[in-house]
Regions:
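Short sequence motifs at beta-strands and strand-loop junctions characteristic
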Residues: 16-20, 75-76, 80-88, 200-208
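Glycine-centered flexibility motif
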Residues: 9-12, 45, 73, 79, ...
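Internal, well-ordered domain-core segments that constitute the primary functional module
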Residues: 27, 45-76, 80-84, 92, ...
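Face-selective signature of the C-terminal outer-membrane beta-barrel domain
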Residues: 87-240
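Flexible, solvent-exposed coil segments and beta strand-coil junctions
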Residues: 2-8, 63-77, 186-197
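Transmembrane beta-barrel wall of Gram-negative outer-membrane proteins
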Residues: 1-9, 13-52, 90-100
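Flexible, surface-exposed loop regions and adjacent strand-edge segments
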Residues: 18-23, 54-69, 123-133, 138
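Short C-terminal domain-edge/linker segments immediately following a structured domain
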Residues: 7, 31-38, 59-60, 69-77, ...
Length: 240
């Protein structure tokens, strides 16, 4: 038996998101007249998807959109999301069934799976936070519109800065990640012999699982069944 399906969305409901997923299954079995049979099955679901980020009510008001997503921006005129998840866990199982007699059966299986999970995040080093909804980029960081008693952040200059920040946020390009500017900043840093100021960090969580199991089933009476089994397994994880 074989089955393959594919699902995708170049643009999700939330702007800047996408989804790609393939799933497959393959199974085969061989039976012999002497009571033995062998079967093999394998399956997997490689997936790539981008994420949506939550923000503050101030940001949603500025963007006039409660579906605002701060995780994406334009690079060379194309949308790029900074939070992308790649997930793939291919698995396979090999099974030997032996009908010893009319009352007794032995089933032995070897199972293996290698799961790979990676998630990315935009990070920075000795530079300004590149996230567009970082609190220092918001109008509220210049002027306190709520607390009339706070004279520190209610000066004429603070109000002018607040208006400037509001107008800056009204531009859609400004409220998304500035990928081209980040690359330009890295090129300038490299020209001065410095390390990259901005980079995409990837976190990996990989696991290998191997299991060998065997079970013996026998009828010892009209309404009695005896079962005994053995299972040996190992799991190896890598996180970096």
């Amino acid at each position: 038996a074989t089955n393959i399906t594919y699902r995708w969305a170049n643009r999700g409901y939330v702007e800047g998101t996408f989804y790609n997923a393939l799933s497959y299954f393959f199974g085969v079995q061989k039976k012999w007249n002497n009571g033995h049979s062998l079967s093999f099955s394998t399956w997997g679901n490689p997936t790539e998807r981008s994420s949506q980020g939550a923000s503050t009510d101030e940001v949603y008001w500025l963007a006039n959109n409660y579906q605002y997503n701060p995780y994406w921006g334009y690079q060379n005129g194309r949308r790029r999301n900074s939070r992308v998840v790649n997930d793939f866990a291919p698995a396979a199982i090999f099974t030997w069934d032996w009908n010893i007699n009319d009352k007794t059966t032995l089933t032995t299986s070897l199972f293996g799976m290698y799961s790979m999970y990676k998630s990315t995040k935009l990070n920075y080093n000795n530079a300004d936070n590149p996230q567009p909804d970082y609190w220092k980029n918001l109008p509220s960081s210049y002027y306190d519109v709520w607390n009339e008693q706070d004279t520190r952040y209610r000066t004429a200059q603070a109000f002018a800065d607040w208006n400037t920040a509001v107008n800056w946020w009204r531009n859609k390009e400004n409220r998304q990640i500035q990928w081209d500017r980040l690359y330009y900043a890295n090129r300038q840093a490299a020209a001065n012999g410095q390390d990259a100021l901005y980079y995409v960090q990837a976190k990996h969580n990989n696991n290998t699982t191997i299991t060998l199991s065997s079970s013996l089933n026998t009828h010892i009476g009209k309404d009695k069944v005896f079962n005994v089994g053995l299972m040996i397994g190992q799991n190896l994880g890598r996180h970096y």
